[in-house]
């Protein structure tokens, strides 16, 4: 399967509610994230992320959505190496403690729900929204933008949930470990570079 076919497979998997793995560039973080569409989140999938991903679960959203929910940047002066745009953390108002997989799934789903309002979220909380650049991976080659781009390509609400993948010893999982994990978990593995090429080809066809 070539790289562009892998993107098509990833989109199909996401539409069917599956998780996928997205790896970024080797000269960037060189990390892999589990990615799912917020529309199809379940407590079981969140539990899979916490058990096997082991990283921080975040919720990529659009800048427009962040404004709608009054989600301001966590830091006014962002000094993160790669400019990851965290907002203040939140919990959905129906949550108990906010940390159970059911509570976190509810918050992820609510962040994507068009009818949700800013007042529906308690701040701070246990979920971390991330604001994606408007042009997606063509503007910033991060997992945040890749996740939102994939949601759009899947004709879903432009919101996803992601989690970095760590090895058993707590170090970051990189190639070839990511390939092994994708095979073990029966998940499609793509790269941000694959997605950039897919989007560039899509734009070229449109023009």
Swiss-Prot record:
Keywords: Lyase, Magnesium, Manganese, Metal-binding, Riboflavin biosynthesis. Mg(2+) 1 binds at residue 29. Binds 2 divalent metal cations per subunit. Magnesium or manganese. Its cofactor is Mg(2+); Mn(2+). D-ribulose 5-phosphate binds at residues 28-29, 33, 140-144, 164. HAMAP family: RibB (MF_00180). This is 3,4-dihydroxy-2-butanone 4-phosphate synthase. It comes from Oceanobacillus iheyensis (strain DSM 14371 / CIP 107618 / JCM 11309 / KCTC 3954 / HTE831). The lineage of its organism: Bacteria, Bacillati, Bacillota, Bacilli, Bacillales. The gene is ribB.
């Amino acid at each position: 399967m070539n790289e562009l076919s892998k993107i098509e497979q990833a989109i199909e998997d996401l539409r069917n509610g599956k998780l996928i793995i997205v790896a970024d560039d080797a000269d960037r973080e060189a990390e892999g994230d589990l990615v799912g569409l917020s529309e199809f989140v379940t407590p079981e999938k969140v539990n899979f992320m916490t058990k096997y991903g082991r990283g921080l679960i975040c919720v990529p959203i659009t800048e427009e959505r962040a404004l709608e929910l009054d989600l301001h940047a966590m830091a006014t002066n962002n000094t993160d190496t790669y400019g990851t745009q965290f907002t203040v953390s939140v919990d959905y108002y129906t949550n108990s403690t906010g940390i159970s997989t059911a509570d976190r799934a509810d918050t992820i789903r609510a962040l994507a729900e068009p009818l949700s309002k800013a007042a529906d979220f308690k701040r701070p909380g246990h979920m971390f929204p991330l604001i994606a650049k408007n042009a997606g991976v063509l503007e910033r080659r991060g997992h945040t933008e890749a996740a939102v781009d994939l949601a759009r390509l899947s004709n879903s609400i432009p919101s996803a949930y992601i989690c970095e993948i760590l090895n058993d010893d707590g170090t970051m999982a990189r190639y070839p470990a990511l390939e092994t994990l994708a095979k073990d978990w029966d998940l499609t593995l793509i790269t941000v570079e694959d997605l950039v090429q897919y989007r560039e080809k899509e734009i070229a066809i449109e023009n």
